[in-house]
Amino acid sequence: MTETEIREIIISGLSQIAPEADFEELSPTENIREELDIDSFDFLNFLIGLDDKLGVDIPESDYEKLISMNDLIGYLQERLS
């Protein structure tokens, strides 16, 4: 799966919990939760959605690594390869 495809899946998932967000303005290196004002419960639901969509199990111990868009893309690329 390409980086672009993974990014589109991430944005699709984020749009479910932050439908008003402008994802074109989302920084690839900034904290997604802060930029989109997402609480921990919504972020957890987003990660569960990624697991459902991609079949990638994301252990709770890895949540702290998933801060920015780049973090998410890199993490998912590694597990999907």
For every predicted segment, state its role.
Residues 18-37, 55, 59-61:
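Phosphopantetheine carrier-protein modules
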Residues 61-71:
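AMP-binding/adenylate-forming catalytic domain of the ANL superfamily
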Residues 42:
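Two-component histidine kinase catalytic core, primarily the HATPase_c
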Residues 1-23, 77-80:
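Thiotemplate assembly-line natural product biosynthesis machinery
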Residues 29, 69, 75:
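Short acidic/histidine-centered micro-motifs embedded in hydrophobic/aromatic stretches
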